[in-house]
Amino acid sequence: MEQYTVTGMSCAACSTRVEKAVSKVPGVTSCSVSLLTNSMGVEGTASEQDIVKAVTDAGYGASKKGSKAAENTKNGSSAAGSSFGDEELLKDRETPVLKKRLLSSLVFLIVLMYFSMGHMMWGWPLPAVLADNHIAMGLIQMLLTIAVMVINQKFFISGFKSLFHKAPNMDTLVALGSAAAFVYSTYALFAMTDAQVHGNMDGVMHYMHEFYFESAAMILTLITVGKMLEAHSKGKTTDALKGLMKLAPKTAVLVKDGVETEVSIEQVQKGDIFIVRPGENIPVDGKVLEGSSAVNESALTGESIPVDKAAGDLVSAATINQSGYLKCEATRVGEDTVLSQIIQMVSDAAATKAPIAKVADKVSGIFVPAVITIAAVTIIVWLLAGQSVGFALARGISVLVISCPCALGLATPVAIMVGNGMGAKNGILFKTAVSLEEAGKIEIVALDKTGTITTGEPKVTDVICNKGVTEKELISFAYALEKKSEHPLAKAVLAYAEAAQTDIFEVNNFTALPGNGLTAEYENAVLSGGNYKFISTRTAVSQEMQEQSQKLANAGKTPLFFTKDDKLLGIIAVADVIKEDSPEAVRQLQNMGIRVVMLTGDNERTAKAIGAQAGVDEVIADVLPDGKDSVISRLKRDGRVAMVGDGINDAPALTRADIGIAIGAGTDIAIDAADIVLMKSRLSDVPAAIRLSRATLRNIHENLFWAFFYNIIGIPLAAGVWIPFFGWKLNPMFGAAAMSLSSFCVVTNALRLNLFSVHNAEKDKKIKSKKKVEDKKMEKTLTIEGMMCGHCEARVKKALEALPEVKEAVVSHEAGTAVVTLESAVSDEALKEAVEAQDYKVISVQ
């Protein structure tokens, strides 16, 4: 996605206009404009010149972001913070300008209000020269109003320019309202002068009360107040993104030929050697060559506990070296660093639009023309009803200035920006606004077992010694054997032995028998290690040890037997243990009304043991890597599905799911395929992400309700609909004040999300979700591998429906499933045999 900065936008109608203009450019596949950040994201093959021209022709300005940074990268020098240049773009320049305009306007407005209303309402004294000099009073009011209009000329330039381009915006409404009040007041001044010349005092008094100079000036000043408050609040919504950008180090200390040199971060290249002293920020992503330290990674992950780093470990830019001296090699620089990628994700998400925003966009596109029409009709109706021009004009002006398309346009993006920032602070990255909105609607969460529910690193859980054997002896011999093994479980045994500081000795004639075990010799004794099947051929295993082994296996652990000659030394159990927060995370998901399913390639016994520990609702075992995609397709029939995984083999399933969630410590492929990335690799962040999504969506609904409600109530009141019934009428000045506050209220409400605690489960509510198909409905779903076309579907359907118990079979080669409706009970084995007789493989039957 290419990012552009757009200038000249003032409301939702502007962003809609720009979006439509760019979307029509040949080669543009998608375009999303953010009024909040004055940015535009464009995808496609269209050239930069064509895109900028389309924006310019629409009456606005545009320039591509980061073009300098891109050039630097091309030349080989790369800025670790090329993305960080956007920090300047996010700087709040609008508030100081508006503040200056407001103060200048107030100086003239206060004087204007003194002359126009002070002496009439509160009896304030006037200079003797102005006493009963109505023409001079009118001229002073006109001149003071002109001063305020000149100060706020931006409304008129932008408003009438947009009207000229047939794309009226909020500035158009303000400009028309203020200009109408000024023009009519000027007419009244000349009419009053004419009456004065002809000695018509009744006419003089009549036209004097038709002055709306103070309304014209007050409208501009109050709208400026609202714009300033809105700009200040909007600036706060990007605090999280600006905070990330500020983390980027500005310099690095490089080492070359033993000489240390401090250079700017833009000069650091991949492969450079740099050093980091205690208390310093790590400048770029790298690999530790020398030294050890505790590194605070809270800036990236939100995890406050420092992580120990030593030679061979990876470090990331913007993390803090807390204790030791580190010498590192730069592995990722510029836009490739983890920090840059996080910033890019958050920035891209802000540049995309949530589906719910489309409603407001459609309304905003016709809102301003509709308001202008309503204002014109209001004036005509009141004139036809016999009211004066001044009265009718006041009602029309009130309609123009009370209407607020900005509140509609800001309702969604401000909440998305704040929600996204809150996620980034907590190590939860939403790639798009769509993922932030849709995550809260999830009904089923499918969890990969390894690395998601479990740590992904096997550990020794039990050490059971045979009679007459000490634990030290068992561990020492096991260590000697496993030291030369490349089996994944060997690492767990080695780590346990090293932690126990066991005796270390070397073995000879080491042999690894794939699928069976290990053998070696030590001081004329033969050492063996492996599974029960292998060891039982070498020595007798007592009933007690067999029962212990069975018990361990039932708990999802892998029992490893070790012998010395024909004597059994004992059993060491190894398991991929579940993460500490997994059971609580699963419980929280269930409390939110979400069904939790665990997917794994492990055998059913091991899978069910892990599933029971985690507390999941359903376990689907023996799923081959390419079978997860089919399982997700089946689950999607029961509701919206989120897939959580970390491996390469999870990527297809992450893409297939409604929402893909990647555990941050996983592979780049899984992260690329996901919609949400969890930086902390903590399962408890899954309910946190869903919780944040729901809170953001709730905030958007509140904002949209306020924006629609405000206009539905405000416009009829301004038009004078209630005057015949209750006598309620709205002065244009109060209409302008209401308009000013409406956008401010929407932005302020969105800022409340900053107070939201993503890990607080106390207020979780269950969603209404589709219920899982129960067994009593006599349906079973087969996940089938090998079907390629409609012919395959027909063969499987015919084979299944040939069974007397099967009423109907619905087969899909795309989903890789067959759903059978049964007349009576039938075994899973019978269904499996019927399909596999046609040369297809049944992965699972549910």
Feature locations, PLM:
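Flexible metal-binding regulatory segments at protein termini and peripheral loops
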Residues: 1-136, 161, 259-260, 344-352, ...
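Conserved ATP-binding TGD loop and adjacent catalytic N/P-domain core of P-type ATPases
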Residues: 16, 29, 442, 522-524, ...
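Conserved cytosolic catalytic loops of P-type ATPases
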Residues: 26-43, 48, 210-211, 242-336, ...
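Juxtamembrane coupling segments of multi-pass membrane pumps/enzymes
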Residues: 75, 195-196, 201-202, 217-278, ...
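Membrane-embedded alpha-helical bundles of multi-pass transporters
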Residues: 121-135, 164, 183, 422, ...
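P-type ATPase nucleotide-binding
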Residues: 460, 464-592, 604, 616-632
